[in-house]
Amino acid sequence: MAVPKKRTSISKKRIRKQIWKRKGYWISLKAFSLGKSLSTGNSKSFFVQQNK
């Protein structure tokens, strides 16, 4: 017979949600930083051809 799982506590749910949000925040910050460096031409990790 199937037994229902215990309910996840609110605090645990909040902690997991914050971790998930924090990961997204850092990824978006890195992406924004990379885009900024590409647009200004200061990128050291990408070689972008400039149209003359």
Swiss-Prot record:
Gene Ontology cellular-component annotations: chloroplast; large ribosomal subunit
Keywords: Chloroplast, Plastid, Ribonucleoprotein, Ribosomal protein
Chief localization: plastid
UniProt source species: Aethionema grandiflorum
Subcellular location field: Plastid, Chloroplast
Presence of the UniProt keyword Plastid in the record: yes
Family: Belongs to the bacterial ribosomal protein bL32 family.
Name used for this protein in its record: Large ribosomal subunit protein bL32c
Pfam families the UniProt entry points to: Ribosomal_L32p
Coiled-coil ranges per UniProt: none
Keyword Plastid: yes
GO biological process: translation
GO molecular function terms noted in the UniProt entry: structural constituent of ribosome
